[in-house]
Amino acid sequence: MIKMTGVQKFFDDFQALTDINLEVPAGQVVVVLGPSGSGKSTLCRTINRLETIEEGTIEIDGKLLPEEGKDLAKIRADVGMVFQSFNLFPHLTIKDNVTLGPMKVRKMKKSEANEVAMKLLERVGIANQAEKYPAQLSGGQQQRVAIARALAMNPKIMLFDEPTSALDPEMVNEVLDVMASLAKEGMTMVCVTHEMGFARRAADRVLFMSDGAIVEDSDPETFFTNPQTDRAKDFLGKILAH
């Protein structure tokens, strides 16, 4: 479903990604862990070309990701993304935030888009907030709207870039629960997160990044109980000590 081959990314002289080779089959849930500045978010953002790459290729569902144009827009429509910030339109109701993409990009009729939106808002547990505006919702609720909005496009892949890091601690679990239920339903997911419990519980596979490279790639049990590199051991020692 996702194939990255020899991907290199620079910000001026700084190499953010080094020779990334990664294949994610359909239905797999991949959690990307690593210290700050290790390239996790950059990796996630290159998958739908929010960040350009200097070398290498990226394929989504067998199609080469172009640099720009209509073909890129088509592929992007199949890749849902949820960010640290919710990026909801403040002047639109919750329901209208969710229906906008399907109507504009998928050319869905308003009645059908409304039906899809209400089903998804139900699924993420906030159908009763459909007519409210983003400012009237908590951070956790807004992030769940952002997930519903991404799902409304019926994506083949969902990317999550630290979706809980801007939330108050008591709101984190409500978002992780939605993500875990998506994982159980077989959605192909790449999640950048610091939530170790989620990684252990919901991931099929853990990637550990350091200095722009993937240095470990294993199942969660192996990674958390028997990490292979000193860098990963050090990282887990610091994180799990708290």
From Swiss-Prot:
Topology within the bilayer: Peripheral membrane protein
A single GO cellular-component term on record? plasma membrane
Q: Which GO terms describe its molecular function?
A: ABC-type amino acid transporter activity; ATP binding; ATP hydrolysis activity
- Under Enzyme Commission nomenclature, its number is 7.4.2.1
A Pfam family that the UniProt record links to this protein? ABC_tran
What reaction does this enzyme carry out catalytically? a polar amino acid(out) + ATP + H2O = a polar amino acid(in) + ADP + phosphate + H(+); L-glutamate(out) + ATP + H2O = L-glutamate(in) + ADP + phosphate + H(+)
Q: Does the keyword Nucleotide-binding apply?
A: yes
What the entry lists under SMART domains is as follows: AAA (SM00382)
Residues annotated as domain ABC transporter: 2-236
List the keywords (alphabetical): Amino-acid transport, ATP-binding, Cell membrane, Membrane, Nucleotide-binding, Translocase, Transport
Q: Which InterPro entries match?
A: AAA+_ATPase, ABC_ATPase_HisP-typ, ABC_transporter-like_ATP-bd, ABC_transporter-like_CS, MetN_ABC_transporter-like, P-loop_NTPase
Q: What does the function comment of this entry state? A: Part of the ABC transporter complex GluABCD involved in glutamate uptake. Probably responsible for energy coupling to the transport system.
Similarity comment text for this entry: Belongs to the ABC transporter superfamily.
This one is known as Glutamate transport ATP-binding protein GluA
Lineage here is: Bacteria, Bacillati, Actinomycetota, Actinomycetes, Mycobacteriales
